[in-house]
Swiss-Prot record:
It comes from Rhodopseudomonas palustris (strain BisB5). The lineage of its organism: Bacteria, Pseudomonadati, Pseudomonadota, Alphaproteobacteria, Hyphomicrobiales. Binds 1 [4Fe-4S] cluster per subunit. It is an enzyme of class 4 (lyase). [4Fe-4S] cluster binds at residues 351, 411, 414. This is 3-isopropylmalate dehydratase large subunit. Its cofactor is [4Fe-4S] cluster.
Length: 470
């Protein structure tokens, strides 16, 4: 009998959830976990209601309000009627269909990709979907997780399955140790800078190497979160003792004999030696600097010690024109030092960098300092539980004393779907995941950075090299 063919982590999870494969490669995949929020779910629930269908597995569905909620006083009505309507619809739909729901007054509420792991709803080896592109976050636990559209949300609600075609495998290995001041956010921005926003198209990425293993679970979530910005369907990291320690004792995690059985399965969730990857990429962690984006795409990355690039140096005409447009939108001049770029706003939060580790990093920078008088800076915890923990550690007092605003949890300024927005031509140092035109507000200018880099920029009034921060 021949030995089993070495298999990748992605292939293992896929094969364990494959219900049926048609001759053309179209597959029906079983879905273990479904996360739902207020923006992409109303039409899906209405479709069920119209057809007289129930939610197939309400116990495998978790709903939370996050995109549209204000991060200020929640005792007042939502100022935006459409947002208020979507929030009310989610509450009604969750009640009518028997789905667990965390509303804006529940301390378990927060950004959907923060609360999933926090509650132990996210587990290794599971398939997870959500009507949100940053569902890849959950891959940090060795889950196959990706975003879906509204029609697919309805399909999963009704059947607990999803029609898919299998992706290819790409492994990204980050060797060595990260220098001081360089973080998980810098790793993923460097990867996107290397492969571009289309480099991962058609792939599921597996992140590996000493630098990835050394990351905390929060750091791993940051890396997997932005897989979609590299064009990938999903991002994965093989689970290990760090993942198990994070999950053990969480409200929705298995207990007792079920935990032991789960652990036996989870320990098989790693790519076999000799498994085939369709593409491989290696980075040297020791060579990575703190990174800032300069343009309107996450691939527009540069070292904090660099200068704004000159599009005239780009041979490809289409790409040159694209970068010229980006520079014009961002109001930047080629050759400008990144450290000479002044900011108006600062945002720390989002499903990329709104966890307790991120807030601790920012507080370490902010302690004993004062926000620059020309900068408005806000800190938005990723969930009510993150907020509660930060306050127990006194981080909120550090921020408030330094002049940062301390807000309620939600998606906030990551996207312009709530009151937290940039005014036209305001420049923001942001820990979120997208710097597209208008992402944070009409004509707003976004620079993606790590939490420590964002906090330092807010205090200095311009970008600074966090490695030299005193």
């Amino acid at each position: 009998m021949s030995a089993a063919k070495p298999t990748t982590l992605y292939d293992k999870i896929w094969n364990d959830h494959l219900v049926h494969e048609a001759e053309d490669g179209t597959c029906l995949l079983y879905i273990d976990r479904h996360l739902v929020h207020e923006v992409t779910s109303p039409q899906a629930f209405e479709g069920l209601r119209t057809a007289g269908r129930k939610v197939h597995s309400p116990e495998k569905t978790l709903a939370v309000v996050d995109h549209n909620v204000p991060t200020t006083d929640r005792s007042k009505p939502n100022p935006d009627p459409e947002s208020a309507e979507q929030i009310a619809a989610l509450a009604e739909n969750a009640r009518d269909f028997g789905v667990t729901y965390y509303n804006e007054h529940d301390k378990r509420q927060g950004v959907v990709h923060v609360i999933g792991p926090e509650q132990g709803f996210t587990l290794p080896g599971t398939t997870i979907v959500c009507g949100d592109s940053h569902t890849s976050t959950h891959g940090a636990f060795g889950a196959l997780a990706h975003g879906i559209g509204t029609s697919e949300v309805e399909h999963v609600l009704a059947t607990q399955t999803l029609i898919q075609k299998k992706a290819k495998n790409m492994r990204v290995t980050v060797d060595g140790d990260l220098p001081d001041g360089v973080t998980a956010k810098d790793i993923i921005l460097a990867i996107i800078g290397e492969i571009g926003t289309a480099g991962g198209t058609g792939y599921v990425l597996e992140y590996a190497g000493d630098a990835i293993r050394a990351l905390s679970m929060e750091g791993r979530m940051t890396v997997c979160n932005m897989s979609i910005e590299g064009g990938a369907r999903a991002g994965l990291i093989a689970p290990d003792e760090k993942a198990y320690a994070y999950l053990k004792g969480r409200p929705m995690a298995p207990t007792g004999a079920n935990w032991d059985a789960a652990m036996r399965y989870w320990d098989t969730l790693r790519s076999d030696e000799g498994a085939h990857f369709d593409h491989e990429l290696r980075l040297d962690a020791a060579a990575l600097p703190p990174i800032v984006t300069w343009g309107t795409s996450p691939e527009d990355v540069i070292s904090i010690t660099g200068r704004v690039p000159n599009p005239a140096d780009i041979a490809d005409e289409a790409k040159r024109l694209s970068k010229e447009r980006a520079l014009a939108y961002m109001g930047l001049t080629p050759g400008t030092r990144i450290t000479d770029i002044k900011i108006d706003r600062m945002f720390i939060g989002s499903c990329t960098n709104g966890r307790i580790e991120d807030l601790r990093a920012a507080a370490k920078v902010a302690e004993g300092k004062t926000v620059n008088g020309n900068v408005s800076a806000m800190i938005v915890p990723g969930s009510g539980l993150v907020k509660e923990q930060a306050e127990a550690e006194g981080l909120d007092k550090i921020f408030v004393k330094a002049g940062f605003e301390w807000r309620e949890p939600g998606c906030s300024m990551c996207l312009a779907m709530n009151p937290d927005k940039l005014a036209p031509e305001e420049r923001c140092a942001s820990t979120s995941n997208r710097n597209f035109e208008g992402r944070q507000g009409f004509k707003g200018r976004t620079h993606l950075v790590s939490p420590a880099m964002a906090a330092a920029a807010a205090i200095a009034g311009h970008f600074v090299d966090i490695r030299e921060w005193r």
